[in-house]
Amino acid sequence: VTTNGFPLPLDTVTLMDVLSAGGYQTALMGKSHLQYFTDNKVRPETFGIKSEKHLPPSELSQATRKRIDGPEYSNELRSAWDADPYRGVNLPYYGFQEAKIALFHADRVGGDYSAWLSENHPDPMSLRGPENALENSNVSAPQAWKTRMPEELYPTSWITGLTLDCLDRYAKNDQPFFIQCGFTDPHHPFTP
């Protein structure tokens, strides 16, 4: 693995595809890591390579020889969500009939969460990151700060709420269901 976020090819048959074909309702709430989530490219220095001319050819830069990129692989790309926080993912998403995506970690989570946070707080950026952290002398670890984000607005609460709402909806009928709940934390940076 040369970088995080290699995408799963869109033509891959997933467990969710099989469950959906069998009559299941399927939902993804939160983090998934099924596609690229950053625009970062592999850096030669990461591997002790002094020059890009020593990198493998581009056709060997991914896990498959067929290129896996383009707009259809931008469902989890942070820059795409920053440009349009209300974009949503293309459904079905790897067999999930319903999906609300959370990208990254701590109080800096993006994806569908950013749109929700904007609808539920007048100035969401004032709650995010170490530059807006609360004073706390007990937090001294690198990549850690005491977040200003209230618990009810924190990504964990959002993902929990979505999952519980989905459970309530799905439980009201006789159709079987599968819900994947992917929390973004615990993960660095830590925001106790």
Q: Model segments located where?
A:
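Formylglycine-dependent sulfatase
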Residues: 1-192
